[in-house]
Amino acid sequence: MGGMQVQITNLTEWLADQGVRQDVLTTGIPGIPRTLQLRDRLTVHSVRFMTLPFKSSQTGTVFLDQSWFMGAVKWIVLNGKKNNYDAIHVHASGVVWPLLAGMFAQKYLKKPLILTIHCSRIFTYKPMNKWDQFVHDFVKSVELKSIKLSHKAVVLTDKRLDSYNRLLEDSSKMTAISDCIGSNHLSHSIDCPFCSRLKTELLGKKTVLFLGRIAHEKGWSTFVSVAKELADKIGDLQFIVCGDGPQREAMEEQIKAANLQNQFRITGFISHKFVSCYLHHAQLFLLPSHHEEFGGSLIEAAIAGVPIISTNNGGPADIFTHGETAILKDPGDVSGIADEAYKILTNDSVAESLRLHSRPEVVSKFLPHCVYPNYLNLYSSKEAAVHEG
């Protein structure tokens, strides 16, 4: 699962444990049951309308988002009015289809709409191709309309909240609730069997870690280019990519062109329970995203005590202080990022300073008990009360 999906999973499970009944509509994949009961009050429905056998460099499968939208609308029409829902919660990430589905559900079911904007199309998102650029203004207008129709709209940082407050005539419905750290990262033991195996495999070599979806917005091409510069300067390094995505083949081609095949490992998608293992065995976490609304993996890295380099746009600049709790550079600044990475990997005092300063700040703000009750308060508000049981 990607970072947003991990955050949604953790949130829905926590809410279910607090007594909130939920039906979650997701894409799913072929071979997985259409309905999964994850908790007594938490049911996940795979609602994809169809799966086409054509690859997409952006979404993985052609018409994946549209397929989910059609399936979600069908499910809402067939099942929505059978259940006495109190609210509709849509998680949006710069893609138009969840926004349209949320507006349809709000009109059809006549229930309050709660919108969480994991990536703002208006302020954060950067179009990835010519078609994306062509529809950019339209999707921004849909995002704005969704916010105006919503009962409450959630953004992930105070900075983004300020941006929307300046844009909207009525900003009273806007609020900021951050991502948070999964409980598995708080209780992880480096003596676990997988950590022991990983330690043996790494042979004591310094490791630079990339954690995320292999897609344009995560800056994987910058990561490989930085790896090339570091390998030329330091030599005996390993680069681990935890994740998969629609541009994996392109990444592998760039790695081959840089003659780095023997220093790279791409794990593919891994269970989130193993993410802590990789973080605890890395000497540097590098996430050079082109746009990043928050960056859940960044706070996970901070908890694990890994020095961090990311970009100074969106969430990373809101979470961290450059030079104190993380290093933040411009997107695509290969030489600048490589220079900072070299300092961290060759100077223990630089790495230790970043480690010591980042973890306390993250712990004070992004633990589950600091974050999730804010959503429960939204659900329990007078206009959108959710009944337990």
UniProtKB/Swiss-Prot annotation:
GO biological process per UniProt: antibiotic biosynthetic process
SUPFAM superfamilies the UniProt entry points to: UDP-Glycosyltransferase/glycogen phosphorylase (SSF53756)
Annotated metabolic or biological route of this protein: Antibiotic biosynthesis; butirosin biosynthesis
Record-linked Pfam families: Glyco_transf_4, Glycos_transf_1
Family matches, as InterPro entries: Glyco_trans_1, Glyco_trans_4-like_N, Glycosyltransferase_grp1
Catalysed reactions, semicolon-separated: 2-deoxystreptamine + UDP-N-acetyl-alpha-D-glucosamine = 2'-N-acetylparomamine + UDP + H(+)
Function summary: Glycosyltransferase involved in the biosynthesis of butirosin by mediating conversion of 2-deoxystreptamine (2-DOS) to 2'-N-acetylparomamine using UDP-alpha-D-glucosamine as sugar donor.
Name of this protein: 2-deoxystreptamine N-acetyl-D-glucosaminyltransferase
